[in-house]
Amino acid sequence: MSQMFSRKWVIGLGVAALFGGVGTYVVTSWHGYGAGHHGMGLHHDEVNMPGLRGANASAETSAEIAVLFNNFDTITREVENLSNGIRTVTRSSDPAVMDALVNHSVTMIDRVGQGDDPKIRIQSPTLDIFFLRGDAITSHVTVEDIGLVVLQTSDDPDVVAALHTHAAEVTAMADKGMQAVHEMMAAQGRTH
């Protein structure tokens, strides 16, 4: 009799667990409640992009970055790693995106020079050294027929390594958009 009681008890628990799991899935899948687009915390909101906000970033800065992420498929990029830095050529087939790209790049290079970290929530930790040692970077920026050309050099080997790393990160974002950010953050054990 006790073996039969145990078997019924185990089957009952199994059925309860199954229904509990199915119920949890259904509830968290409903629009507005779970892992869906606009859910309550278990999602990535790629419409409003709250991860683009920063403690020291204006709404305009965040909106400009959103333009780049929302239109990443119009952006192409070439990177040459130099022994003392990088040379990049970045372009967009969309004139409005190209304007945002140029403005963002020039503004960020200026902010690095001033040590003015925007502290964007999804910002790569690679940028930390730039804001700490911005005076160790020499930047030359031009807009040419081939695109936005950025040459950045440094005598500081740590800064050069960070320039190489960040150039690769930006290229990944130009290739994959926000997916690249999610992959980088997951690899670093970070969330936003």
Where are these regions (language model features)?
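Hydrophobic alpha-helical segments of integral membrane proteins
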Residues: 16-27
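Extracellular/periplasmic low-complexity linear segments
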Residues: 26-72, 77-81, 87, 102-137, ...
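N-terminal export leaders
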Residues: 6-11, 15
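Primarily extracytoplasmic ectodomains and periplasmic/lumenal surface modules that are beta-strand-rich
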Residues: 85-86, 94-99, 107-110, 156-160
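A short, solvent-exposed beta-edge/loop patch
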Residues: 138-161, 168
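Terminal, regulation- and interaction-focused segments at domain boundaries
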Residues: 80-96, 147, 151
